[in-house]
Amino acid sequence: MANKRKPIVNWILFLATIVAVFFLGLLASSITERRAEEVTSCKPEVKIGEWEPRNEVWGKNYPSEYESYMLNDESDFATKYNGNAMIDMLEVDPRLVVLWAGYGFSKDYNQGRGHTYAISDLRNSLRTGAPVDDNTGPMPATCWTCKSPDVPRVMNEDGVKEFYTGKWARLGDDVVNPIGCADCHNNETMDLQISRPALVEAYERMGKDINKATHQEMRSLVCAQCHVEYYFDKKRPGAEGSAYLTFPWDGGMSVEAMEEYYDAIEFKDWTHKLSKAPMLKAQHPGYEVYLTGIHAERGVSCADCHMPYMSEGGKKYTDHHIQSPLNNIENSCMVCHKEKTAQLLKDVYDRQDRIIETRDKLEELIVRAHVEAKKAWDLGATEEQMKDILMDIRHSQWRWDYAAASHGGSFHSPVELGRVISTGITTAQEGRIKLARLLIELGFDGEVPYPDIETKAKAQEFIGLPVDKLKEEKQRFLKELAPEWDKKAKERESKMPIVYTNN
């Protein structure tokens, strides 16, 4: 006789089926709704022109990305050593003033803020001087290269060599939109693309084709357009008279390879005011240092950590709030690392502490070398006597600056930076030993006093910098010429139509 199923069991099965169907229906509805949201979000509102520099225009088609991009305005996050707030680094470390004596960075050097401040911070910097017209001021037009999506537009209109020619002030009314969309994206496909010729040219000289880079490589290469070491080549064949932006990678990207490149062409950024050494100023070799680290070795890109993926309404997109991963650990570090936040922070700070400790020791040695070299000159040293000493100063400070200017390098590649700093310490000490022998030969057998540079003001006074005059001139520029630039730019952009698609 067949077993009869109890009525209660039938009811349970019936109710379970209803519940299952209900939740499947919710899931299907959610998927359909999210697909609809994604389709809607991908409908372009405007047609973006090939050289469109205005980030807000791109934002009409990509509101999520643009909304996150505007978070770059924030400047209230601080880590142990860095962050996104404006910090006067010369006040934090007055020794920098002496290291850069005779160079623009001794006037003004602040910790970088978000990309949205690229134009305003450059205008406000004492390094760009106080031009009164298109043909005055200390800096070349090339200094705009990495600051704005207006740059590829102007390069297309005028030519690359022409862009690099003349004074910084010449392009003041042309370059007004801060770093943004067109710097990294194709206007039609949104694919990542290289918009600055210096990176492409550097690849060509190394025998590489940047067009063969993978998408993952491009997620770092778009950053490498600017976060690299570079110099202004004023002797480039066919571009004489310009300050042609060039990456010194022909023989490799290591600190030694770039040093050899510069030495071979006898290039110098400036002559040091105290020691008279032919100096090199490292710009920001972040990409070169990153390539020597474990994350690059594992295939992790810049964007993976500094611009991680986000999800919203069924849409996956890249967070364009470009910031320290320490302000977004969950979406950056914890995608791969499962340690607790406190442990991850400790790992980062431990590496930074150790690199900065040794970097500061090198820094003091070089300050002493500059001051001792000045003493030798004052005592009548000859150029022949000083030649090798000055090269030691040049090479040791190049290594210090390579480590100091590669922002984040103490985490990106602590092993390599530790090696670079150690060779810098050795070179600085060798130079100081030679100086000690020369000073004795010149009749001085005492210790050259270390200068009183406890504050930025004292350090700038020590090197004879007329700070008050520079600030007064800068304020005049900001009140008189800068507003004229903005007025002309507004008039020009008012004639650039925004074409709506009417979808």
Feature-to-residue mapping (PLM):
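Single-pass type I membrane protein transmembrane segment
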Residues: A16-I18
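Extended, compositionally biased alpha-helical segments that mediate assembly or anchoring
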Residues: K488-N503
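Asp/Glu-centered strand-loop micro-motifs enriched in Gly/Pro and often flanked by an aromatic residue
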Residues: F105-G137, A141
